[in-house]
Amino acid sequence: MLQPKRTKYRKKQKGRCSGLATRGDRVSFGEFGLKATTRGPITSRQIEAARRAINRYIRRGGKIWIRVFPDKPVTEKPLEVRMGKGKGNVDHWCEPIAPGRVLYELEGVSEEVAREAFRRAAAKLPVKTTFVNRTVM
């Protein structure tokens, strides 16, 4: 699973993700991309599950780029613990996604194969997505 090797601080505030994506909103590396149309956090496990779904379908046919990296720690308190007594321990890592962000890119496969691979990957993600071409951008 993806997570930073080291961070300046162990824990972060929850924060809010507003507006549209200003960076990472274009297909830069491959021919086709999977772009988010809604906002929400994506965990490292969801990123990995979608990557596996894409790889399983394209079968070494092309190259895949993962354009998101989970760098925000999510904390959780243990079960049956009363409120207070400080912030909980880091449970997992996530990436806040804004609408317009390109999540994955593919090249070296046909458009039909890319569409189906991204459709299967989108089923693993908590945000709604759309298929984009490099020429459209």
UniProtKB/Swiss-Prot annotation:
Family annotation (Gene3D superfamilies): Ribosomal protein L10e/L16
Entry GO CC: cytosolic large ribosomal subunit
Pfam families given in the database record: Ribosomal_L16 (PF00252)
Keyword line: Ribonucleoprotein, Ribosomal protein, RNA-binding, rRNA-binding, tRNA-binding
GO biological process: translation
Disulfide bonds: none
UniProt keyword annotation of tRNA-binding present: yes
rRNA-binding as UniProt keyword: yes
GO MF entries: rRNA binding; structural constituent of ribosome; tRNA binding
InterPro entries in alphabetical order: Ribosomal_uL16 (IPR047873), Ribosomal_uL16_bact-type (IPR000114), Ribosomal_uL16_CS (IPR020798), Ribosomal_uL16_dom (IPR016180), Ribosomal_uL16_sf (IPR036920)
Record text on subunit structure and interactions: Part of the 50S ribosomal subunit.
Family to which the UniProt record says this protein belongs: Belongs to the universal ribosomal protein uL16 family.
Role this protein plays: Binds 23S rRNA and is also seen to make contacts with the A and possibly P site tRNAs.
Name of this protein: Large ribosomal subunit protein uL16
Organism: Halorhodospira halophila (strain DSM 244 / SL1) (Ectothiorhodospira halophila (strain DSM 244 / SL1))
